[in-house]
Curated annotation (Swiss-Prot):
Record note on cofactor: Binds 1 FMN per subunit.
Listed GO MF terms: electron transfer activity; FMN binding; heme binding; metal ion binding; oxidoreductase activity, acting on diphenols and related substances as donors
Membrane topology, as annotated: Multi-pass membrane protein
Job description of the protein: Part of the MsrPQ system that repairs oxidized periplasmic proteins containing methionine sulfoxide residues (Met-O), using respiratory chain electrons. Thus protects these proteins from oxidative-stress damage caused by reactive species of oxygen and chlorine generated by the host defense mechanisms. MsrPQ is essential for the maintenance of envelope integrity under bleach stress, rescuing a wide series of structurally unrelated periplasmic proteins from methionine oxidation.
Subcellular location(s) per record: Cell inner membrane
Organism name: Pseudomonas entomophila (strain L48)
Family designation: Belongs to the MsrQ family.
Highest taxon of the lineage: Bacteria
Subunit structure: Heterodimer of a catalytic subunit (MsrP) and a heme-binding subunit (MsrQ).
Keyword tags: Cell inner membrane, Cell membrane, Electron transport, Flavoprotein, FMN, Heme, Iron, Membrane, Metal-binding, Transmembrane, Transmembrane helix, Transport
HAMAP family found in the cross-reference section: MsrQ
Membrane-crossing segments per the record: 10-30, 37-57, 75-95, 110-130, 147-167, 169-189
Cofactor (UniProt): FMN; heme b
Annotated protein name in UniProt: Protein-methionine-sulfoxide reductase heme-binding subunit MsrQ
Length: 203
């Protein structure tokens, strides 16, 4: 297995945050509504993992280090794990597993539908993020996994709908996502290594 320490570090970090948040909740450190805070943190964590996952290919392109690509799938699966925990937190802490209330919530809060669509997209990517699916799907596999950019848009829209009153934090994540998307435009993508190489030579 290549870069085992890098993989292990990501695994430890991926586990550490939810465990710490659960500890804070158990110790009564998250205020009067710990379930909502847990849900919000897990959702934000999923968005962060998604942005980090999308940054792996540009980082490999810029630095030439293959380790970024090696951990890309692992990061994507952590994003999915966090979004599953986010959904479970919503169902348990917010709805109290009241499935009848879930239908009411869908009608009252459209951002939940947006979030659900993002979850289904991530589910499709997680299920097919293996070599068997790559072989079976062939060229269609890459097309399917381009859905990640649609999922990013859905995640940012979901986040925007929730934090309508304070857009500062949202703007940071949206800006990072925008830069990552612009970098994937073919003319930009082709020029970035040249710019970095030129800068390196100048230095």
């Amino acid at each position: 297995m290549r870069y085992p320490w890098f993989r292990l570090a990501i695994f430890v970090l991926g586990c550490l945050f939810p465990l710490w948040w659960f500890y804070e909740a158990a110790m009564g450190l998250l205020g009067p509504d710990p379930g909502k805070i847990m849900m919000d943190r897990l959702g934000l964590g999923a968005l962060v993992f998604l942005l980090i996952t999308l940054s792996m290919t540009p980082l490999q392109r810029l630095t030439g280090w293959s380790g970024w690509i090696v951990v890309r799938r692992q990061l994507g699966l952590w994003c999915f794990a966090y979004i599953v925990l986010h959904l479970v937190s919503y169902l348990v802490f917010i709805l109290g597993l009241d499935w009848g209330q879930f239908g009411v919530e869908l009608r009252k809060r459209p951002y939940i539908i947006v979030g659900a669509l993002g979850f289904l997209g991530l589910l499709a990517l997680a299920v097919t993020s293996n070599r068997y699916s790559q072989r079976r799907l062939g060229a269609r596999w890459k097309k399917l996994h381009r859905l990640v950019y649609v999922i990013l848009g859905l995640g940012l829209l979901h986040f925007l709908w929730i934090v309508r009153s304070d857009l500062k934090e949202w703007a940071i994540y949206a800006g990072i996502g925008g830069v990552l998307l612009v970098m994937r435009i073919p003319p930009v993508w082709r020029r970035v290594p040249r710019l970095m190489g030129g800068r390196g030579r100048a230095a």
